[in-house]
Amino acid sequence: MHPFSRLFRNIQSLEEEVQELLGPPEDALPLLAGEDLNHRVADALNLHLPTADLQWVHKTNAITGLYSNQAAQFNPNWIQPEFPELHLHNDLIQKLQQYFGPLTINEKRKLQLNFPARFFPKATKYFPLIKGIKNHYPNFALEHFFATANYLWTLWEAGILYLRKNQTTLTFKGKPYSWEHRQLVQHNGQQHKSHLQSRQNSSMVACSGHLLHNHLSSESVSVSTRNLSNNISDKSQKSTRTGLCSYKQIQTDRLEHLARISCGSKIFIGQQGSSPKTLYKSISSNFRNQTWAYNSSRNSGHTTWFSSASNSNKSRSREKAYSSNSTSKRYSPPLNYEKSDFSSPGVRRRITRLDNNGTPTQCLSRSFYNTKPCGSYCIHHIVSSLDDWGPCTVTGDVTIKSPRTPRRITGGVFLVDKNPNNSSESRLVVHFSQFSRGHTRVHWPKFAVPNLQTLANLLSTNLQWLSLDVSAAFYHIPISPAAVPHLLVGSPGLERFNTCLSSSTHNRNNSQLQTMHNLCTRHVYSSLLLLFKTYGRKLHLLAHPFIMGFRKLPMGVGLSSSLLAQFTSALASMVRRNFPHCVVFAYMDDLVLGARTSEHLTAIYSHICSVFLDLGIHLNVNKTKWWGNHLHFMGYVITSSGVLPQDKHVKKISRYLLSVPVNQPLDYKISERLTGILNYVAPFTLCGYAALMPLYHAIASRMAFIFSSLYKSWLLSLYEELWPVVRQRGVVCTVFADATPTGWGIATTCQLLSGTYAFPLPIATAELIAACLARCWTGARLLGTDNSVVLSGKLTSFPWLLACVATWILRGTSFCYVPSALNPADLPSRGLLPALRPLPRLRLRPQTTRISLWAASPPVSPRAPVRVAWSSPVQTCEPWIPP
């Protein structure tokens, strides 16, 4: 049935022309290309763009447009996924060769790209830590803050993230890879050999500093060092009160005193003619080596909450002993110390500790412990409920050296639903969009996406199908530690949670603690109580600031999808070579197996599962589905008769089209979203994408669009009748078409046909009409033409009525290119009918190019004795090749 038959009969202005427009194609097609007819139909259907004085509609029943964005929905009961131990085998390529034999060059290249993956952008912009967790849910800011921090710590515990310890050190959990062994500092609590050697050298230099000090005169040394100790104690107490204890200031004061002592005693290092500048440098380097050695010796210790009075007294006694022992044996202050400073008698107590860089870090949440509550909803009541809140931070099993990693982030994070159909679980979104914007953007590599015709050519067969899903596929691929400074995420901590207040202001009244007291509201208090019920003592760890870098491939970078496609396609290629009787292909994290019988498919599945598990690749058992003869893939149902969309997409389109209001100007954002939904099913309709050309025009003009009742009912009728996309056949071309602006010609193996147009047409339009006539009169599924526009199959650039009818006529037709000099229909199109001559032999190759799904099946290499033996239950020994 003609797609426009009902529509033309309902248009009153076309009553006299309906029979002619629906008549023979050689008469109707040139008329459909006329500009006047297209304008009259557009007027009847009200497809012209409306005037600007009309008020636009920004929201329909199912689709939102401009100025009506839906607020994100936060689920307080989100279940965070549990990640298994995702660790690929260290010698992955060698292990694969044991199972699948020698790898091809392409397979090796793809695996080497991913093991490890590398990411080095042109420029990286760093953001303050306060932007680490995006305020995506303003009404649930605190709950989202702790849920996101807990998600990041869960990824760290699974070995997916590095934890930044200082500028040059990272720690993580799990087994180190071979490239991480070269940067090892500590493994399972034991120092690595190379790191131990450097520590011994530093200890020797530190001992030389002690020998130098013992040569100093006892009187001047004792007096000066006593003054030095008192000076440092005064400065540290002062900085403790203001919250600005500077370890660099202590180092500078100590070096100045040591320089004065040495110069006053006229003791020189090395030669007698050394200058005071050389002396100062020598003492400075000795002091740095002593301090570094001391830091390394205490590096394994962690600060832990112990709030008992005995511990406080012990810390005070240690402080008193340290300050009184003026000529002590060591010259660097302890890096983990506690001091009590009472700005008001017996009220406030601040705990200050220095990290491995020497910068002060304060556990402000602990500062509430010995302070008076500011009200009924003070955080003090929650903090004082437990004596031991656990450590402020943790250290992983492995510590490695890294490039300089700043105390900044490169992208924010937030949580969303796992997918539109699963709102009970959460998914982490990493916002690394800076690498895709601006003049320093990264040009990501392109990877092949399977189109609809290719899927039909490969998979439209009568096989038994099984689909597998790789669990957390992106997190299987490791990334080089050198890329960590470019992929940083983190949390600002609870003390910086309230972004309205500036955390950089300091005064003598404990401004940071006062900032924490600003959080003491009823809402925050009740939320923290509920969060404590969820996280327990871990709430203290989540409240601390931290910075993490990705150890595995993140999903928020454009490089990730390309690398994952390379990785899974290499695996599919190896399995395909070793099981020539089955079909194996992969797209992203989906792996599909096809075999002739279910028994054969079961045997392949069990073998692949055991091999992948040994390699460290985890499959999601819950998402493994046996489809039988109807494969569900990428939203399509693929059978031996062709490809059709799934029922859920068809029902969704019907619901959206019915909800569209009639005779109201809809803004272009609604048109964009509606067109995106309709485009998914458009290839299965009679008129294809050409039916949506009026919507395309409104979107390109950024204007409103008015749906008339006729156009809406016509779209509904189109999307109610769907036709499958069938497989292409490898046949020889026997029909050729050509045209001139005034005539057309068709050549077959047994006859030559020609004709003329009633009026001159554009050459591309004339060529398209000639191809339609050849398809109607010969029924050939393969046509030869010399016009590139017709060969492309994109008909949306033609007049609307002609494009719709041509899509209907040429549905399921393939084209092959023939040069004009060799086109046998060239002379008939010019009005000449020469004698028949042999046609050029052109054979159609079904479209399988630019796709990473299917690997060719070259001869399988001889199996090595160490490989797994597997015998196919299929009786025939000939390899099965997709059509």
From Swiss-Prot:
The UniProt record lists the Reverse transcriptase domain at 397-638
Which keywords has UniProt assigned to this entry? DNA replication, DNA-binding, DNA-directed DNA polymerase, Endonuclease, Host-virus interaction, Hydrolase, Inhibition of host innate immune response by virus, Inhibition of host RLR pathway by virus, Magnesium, Metal-binding, Multifunctional enzyme, Nuclease, Nucleotidyltransferase, RNA-directed DNA polymerase, Transferase, Viral immunoevasion
Enumerate the residue ranges of region (Spacer): 184-386
Q: Name one GO biological process term.
A: symbiont-mediated suppression of host innate immune response
Origin superkingdom? Viruses
In this chain, the site described as Priming of reverse-transcription by covalently linking the first nucleotide of the (-)DNA is at Y67
Residues spanning the signal sequence: none
Task: State which Enzyme Commission number(s) the record gives.
Answer: 2.7.7.7, 2.7.7.49, 3.1.26.4
Regulation affecting activity: Activated by host HSP70 and HSP40 in vitro to be able to bind the epsilon loop of the pgRNA. Because deletion of the RNase H region renders the protein partly chaperone-independent, the chaperones may be needed indirectly to relieve occlusion of the RNA-binding site by this domain. Inhibited by several reverse-transcriptase inhibitors: Lamivudine, Adefovir and Entecavir.
Metal-binding as UniProt keyword: yes
Q: Which reaction does it catalyse?
A: DNA(n) + a 2'-deoxyribonucleoside 5'-triphosphate = DNA(n+1) + diphosphate; Endonucleolytic cleavage to 5'-phosphomonoester
Q: Does the keyword Transmembrane apply?
A: no
What are the disulfide bonds?
A: none
InterPro entries documented for this protein: DNA/RNA_pol_sf, DNApol_viral_C, DNApol_viral_N, HBV_DPOL, Hepadnavirus_pol/RT, Rev_trsase/Diguanyl_cyclase, RT_dom
The entry marks the following residues as binding Mg(2+), namely: D469, D589, D590
Question: What are the boundaries of the region Disordered?
Answer: 298-344
Q: Where is this region: Polymerase/reverse transcriptase domain (RT)?
A: 387-728
Please give one Gene Ontology molecular function term for this protein: DNA-directed DNA polymerase activity
Q: Where is this region: Terminal protein domain (TP)?
A: 1-183
Additional comment: Hepadnaviral virions contain probably just one P protein molecule per particle.
Q: Which PANTHER family match?
A: REVERSE TRANSCRIPTASE DOMAIN-CONTAINING PROTEIN (PTHR33050), RIBONUCLEASE H (PTHR33050:SF7)
Q: What is known of its domains?
A: Terminal protein domain (TP) is hepadnavirus-specific. Spacer domain is highly variable and separates the TP and RT domains. Polymerase/reverse-transcriptase domain (RT) and ribonuclease H domain (RH) are similar to retrovirus reverse transcriptase/RNase H.
Q: What does this protein do, in the record's words?
A: Multifunctional enzyme that converts the viral RNA genome into dsDNA in viral cytoplasmic capsids. This enzyme displays a DNA polymerase activity that can copy either DNA or RNA templates, and a ribonuclease H (RNase H) activity that cleaves the RNA strand of RNA-DNA heteroduplexes in a partially processive 3'- to 5'-endonucleasic mode. Neo-synthesized pregenomic RNA (pgRNA) are encapsidated together with the P protein, and reverse-transcribed inside the nucleocapsid.
Q: Name the protein family.
A: Belongs to the hepadnaviridae P protein family.
Protein's name in the database: Protein P
This protein's species is: Woodchuck hepatitis B virus (isolate 2)
